[in-house]
Amino acid sequence: VRCVEETGYTIDSSTNVTAEELAADTLLSKDLHIDPASGEYKVLIYHTHGSETFADSRPGVIEDTVIGLGDELTRILEEDYGIPVYHDRTVYDVVDGVEDRSLAYDYASDGIDAILQQYPSIEVVLDIHRDGVREDVRLVRDIDGVPTAQIMFLNGMSRTNENGEIDYLYN
């Protein structure tokens, strides 16, 4: 667990994880390469909160939302890496024209389950969001002279220290 924390992962103080649950030896022994040779979809990109926008987004322009970001990531993975991507552009957090995030994960789950049943070749599933941060926070750093946005991969444990396992979310 300490190695995970020392290499860029954060374990939130409201939860916990054991070495057995991480199963690092099992993970490190797996071949995680994606073989695009079959031409079948290997990556699924979707957006539980597809209406999320950025500070400079133009109102009503879907290309300026996280869905537009997903379009660009799809293009890069397909054109630069040859990895076939299924990009689900469904806006799961707008119901009858009104933004409603309360059931977005339920709606997305139904949609994603159907896609995964239709395309069992998919190996990687990415739900792309954007974080809301204070106006004075800048999540850009210089990498080799290129301004680069910080990204975060979130792998969640469905339990809290206070209440234990969360019954409706499976680890």
Q: Residues of each region from the PLM?
A:
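Short amphipathic alpha-helices and their capping/turn segments at secondary-structure boundaries
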Residues: 23-39, 114-117
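Active-site-proximal beta-strand/loop segments in catalytic clefts of secreted hydrolases
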Residues: 46-49, 88-91, 127-131, 155-158
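N-terminal low-complexity, Pro/Thr/Ser-rich intrinsically disordered segments
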Residues: 6-23
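Active-site-proximal helix/loop segments of hydrolytic enzymes
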Residues: 102, 106-124, 130-171
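Short, small-residue-biased leader/transition segments that mark boundaries at the very start
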Residues: 2-4
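Active-site histidine-acidic residue metal-binding/catalytic motifs
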Residues: 30-102
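Long, folded non-catalytic interaction modules
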Residues: 14-16, 25-29, 94-113, 138
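Residues that cap or initiate secondary-structure elements
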Residues: 17-19, 49-51, 159
